[in-house]
Amino acid sequence: MESYKEVWLKAGLIYALNLLSSGNLKPVEIGLGERYFYVDIDSPDILTLDEAKDFAKYNQYDYQLVEDNRGSITVVYNGHQIKLNGGKPNQNVHPKYFQILSISVHHPSPEKQYVRVLGVGFEKEEQLKDYLNWLEKVSEYDHRIIGDRLDLFSFPEEAPPGVVLFHPNGQIIRKEMMRFMEEINDSMGYKEVYTSHVYRSLLWKISGHYDYYKDKMLLFEIDNDEELGIKPMNCPAHILIYKSKVRSYKDLPIRFSEFGHVYRWEKKGELYGLLRVRGFTQDDGHIFLREDQIKDEIKLLMKKTLDVLAIFGFKGDDVRVNLSTRPDESIGTDEQWNKATDALISALNELNIKYEVKEKEGAFYGPKIDFDIRDSLSRWWQLSTIQVDFNLPERFKLEYVDKDGSKKRPVMVHRAIYGSIDRFMAILLEHFRGKLPTWLSPIQVRVLPITDEIEDYGNSLMAKLRENKIRVDMDSGEETLSKRIKKAYDDGVPYLIIVGRKEKDEGKVTVRARGNIEIRGINVEKFVQALVEEIRNKDLNQSAVSKLK
């Protein structure tokens, strides 16, 4: 898949100009990426996927690229101007094989609505074929399909678009993820808090969200005179807790954590399963500290973040670390930015972590470190983030009493290791292709009695497993054993216990694991102990199998 990233896509330009030649379609923006291009069209007509593909023919056009003093590039062709998003194209590269992948509605603003055509292009036909085959493979493991099959979540019509309902099986996965993060937070000295979902708009005006984030906020009035807003972020509420009492330099760092549910009113056309929703839960954390504490805190956060990612199998070359520096528009002094950036760099170097510098891509309120992960389908996802913030402490006039009795402004660090629990769950479902590690699996063991008369033995086995906190159910249906085994596999159950008359008489079990591994005559206690250890260690592979052989 790496070779695809080296192909610069001029296909988007060519495609947009083809659309212009159709007469009634007006491209307004072209986006060019590593593999994909998109064209936003202002059209009074409905464009179907088949019609779009008809326009996707390679032609040569005489166009001009006009760059203004801000670096924005416009494509000019036959008097038409089209905004170019993604940089100046290499006119020596001409992908000849491209495919239109999808058509969707794009909302650049509340007042505008465009048709977005998404495509991909390559210089070689084999590259395109390989890519389309890969895309088909990826679609088989779409988390929405897996979620429906495993009965994890749903998006009912009665709920607004982008609002998910987690079913019992899905909530088990979420709770396991949260329990693990609670352990991590406890090990770092966090104190868990709980904050309200609704606040006066005054809070969001102080924080700046009202000015910069209003379009994505849910705002409403009560008593015809007071405006309230549902939180899009947890940080302002954590700040209110910090401000609730006088803080001393000896108290710092103060670490708050929360599994906070936030709401962001994304455009309907941008919603996508659990990956893009309007309400989601963050494993949020905020640290209030002195400037001289930044480096040590960042080192702790980075080590723990890498430890967490490794538990899920993301390590080595499957993790990328990015350092984003001060953008042109920012707040804070040069001294503060230099001190914070130097602290991040020192922390990275002392931990011997390779990283890429993304110049001027930091937040306006401080530098940040992001962690990208690569899944089993070779896709990269931006996941964990650590952000230094000078802005909110200034806006809220946060203080601590220093050793000399003077009042000082603390620095704030935002961190989220999962990012969004819901989004990370979607990534894991696709990464593991529905076959989650045992510790995350909603059902960890399924008992399959061969005949009805063995059910009592099956019930006693379930009781034994439940005593040891193992999630278990039993399928004693009328279908054949082979069909029940297949159903358990489709349900993502990692271990099956098959019991017949012989197993009951001997007080043993036959254990079947993923990969068609079957071990007969296993002592029940031995199986339980091996499974408990596998779950406790959060093993990715079925380590209990090796202990049973």
From Swiss-Prot:
- Note how many cofactor molecules are bound and how: Binds 1 zinc ion per subunit.
Q: Which cysteines are joined by disulfide bonds?
A: none
Query: Which UniProt keywords are present, listed alphabetically?
Result: Aminoacyl-tRNA synthetase, ATP-binding, Cytoplasm, Ligase, Metal-binding, Nucleotide-binding, Protein biosynthesis, RNA-binding, tRNA-binding, Zinc
Q: Where is this region: Catalytic?
A: 142-437
Q: Gene behind this chain? A: thrS-cat
Q: What cofactors does the UniProt entry give for this protein? A: Zn(2+)
Listed SUPFAM superfamilies: Class II aaRS ABD-related, Class II aaRS and biotin synthetases, ThrRS/AlaRS common domain
Q: Which family would the database say this protein is a member of?
A: Belongs to the class-II aminoacyl-tRNA synthetase family.
Query: What is the designated name of this protein?
Result: Threonine--tRNA ligase catalytic subunit
Q: Which PROSITE patterns match?
A: AA_TRNA_LIGASE_II (PS50862)
Role: Catalyzes the attachment of threonine to tRNA(Thr) in a two-step reaction: L-threonine is first activated by ATP to form Thr-AMP and then transferred to the acceptor end of tRNA(Thr). Also activates L-serine and transfers it to tRNA(Thr) but cannot deacylate incorrectly charged amino acid; unlike most archaea the editing function is found in a freestanding protein.
Any single Pfam family the record assigns to this protein = tRNA-synt_2b
Q: Where is this protein found?
A: Cytoplasm
Q: Where is it found, in Gene Ontology cellular component terms?
A: cytoplasm
Q: Does the keyword Ligase apply?
A: yes
Q: What is its EC number?
A: 6.1.1.3
Origin species, per record, is Sulfolobus acidocaldarius (strain ATCC 33909 / DSM 639 / JCM 8929 / NBRC 15157 / NCIMB 11770)
KW ATP-binding (keyword) present: yes
Which BP terms from GO are recorded?
threonyl-tRNA aminoacylation
What is known about its subunit structure? Answer: Homodimer. Probably interacts with its editing subunit.
A GO molecular-function annotation: threonine-tRNA ligase activity
